Amino acid sequence: MLILTRRVGETLMIGDLVTVTVLGVKGNQVRIGIDAPKDVAVHREEIYQRIQRGDEPVASGAHHNDDCSD
């Protein structure tokens, strides 16, 4: 596992097309933004596991808005 340190506002690249930006840190929560092509699915791990088990249908566009709550 690659471990990186980033500050709020800093970004890292995954390949040429995916960027991950640290948007904020509050207590033990880190808020990140992910910019990826529409054909790249992005999910929180627990959502991904539910999808793999067939517990949750994949909604169109859900890969860009898994958890937008504060």
Curated annotation (Swiss-Prot):
Q: What's the family? A: Belongs to the CsrA/RsmA family.
Query: What's this protein's function?
Result: A key translational regulator that binds mRNA to regulate translation initiation and/or mRNA stability. Mediates global changes in gene expression, shifting from rapid growth to stress survival by linking envelope stress, the stringent response and the catabolite repression systems. Usually binds in the 5'-UTR; binding at or near the Shine-Dalgarno sequence prevents ribosome-binding, repressing translation, binding elsewhere in the 5'-UTR can activate translation and/or stabilize the mRNA. Its function is antagonized by small RNA(s).
Gene3D superfamilies, per this entry?
A: Translational regulator CsrA
List locations, semicolon-separated: Cytoplasm
What does the subunit comment say? Homodimer; the beta-strands of each monomer intercalate to form a hydrophobic core, while the alpha-helices form wings that extend away from the core.
Kindly list the biological process annotations in GO that this record carries: mRNA catabolic process; negative regulation of translational initiation; positive regulation of translational initiation; regulation of carbohydrate metabolic process
Record's keyword terms, sorted: Activator, Cytoplasm, Repressor, RNA-binding, Translation regulation
Quote the InterPro entries the UniProt record gives: CsrA (IPR003751), CsrA_sf (IPR036107)
Gene Ontology cellular-component terms for this entry are: cytosol
For molecular function, the Gene Ontology terms on record are:
mRNA 5'-UTR binding
Q: What is this protein called?
A: Translational regulator CsrA
SUPFAM superfamilies in the record, alphabetically?
A: CsrA-like
